[in-house]
């Protein structure tokens, strides 16, 4: 099942479509752009069904996935072990679980660059 459908089924009212509350944390639906010029979470006025994230690493030997996990761990000031790639290991469309975070925590961290 595609990441967007997964989020739509599990999302609670009032949250951005890319964010899903789960037991023990939250999940993010992410569209990853490898081989970008910078590592960044793309700022958007209105978030879509997926959070767009760019990494400089190529999509080879899981390098882009590792860069994604590092970037999210830095942004959310947590250990890399708290960031789990749940689905989409070989796709640009991914589901990431952030263990120990609330939806409010995530939205606050995304708002503060």
Regions found by a protein language model. Name each.
Residues 2-69, 78, 84-85, 89, ...:
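Contiguous, often N-terminal, cationic amphipathic patches that form binding interfaces
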Residues 75:
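C-terminal catalytic core of tyrosine-transesterase DNA break-rejoin enzymes
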């Amino acid at each position: 099942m595609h990441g967007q459908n997964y989020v739509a089924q599990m999302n609670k009212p009032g949250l951005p479509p890319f964010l899903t509350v789960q037991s023990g944390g939250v999940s993010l639906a992410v569209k990853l752009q490898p081989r970008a010029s910078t590592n960044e979470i793309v700022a958007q006025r209105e978030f879509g069904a997926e959070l767009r994230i760019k990494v400089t690493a190529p999509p080879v030997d899981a390098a882009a996935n590792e860069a994604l996990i590092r970037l999210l761990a830095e942004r959310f000031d947590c250990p890399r072990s708290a960031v789990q790639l749940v689905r989409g290991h070989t796709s640009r469309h991914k589901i990431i679980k952030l263990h120990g975070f609330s939806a409010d925590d995530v939205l606050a961290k995304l708002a503060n660059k």
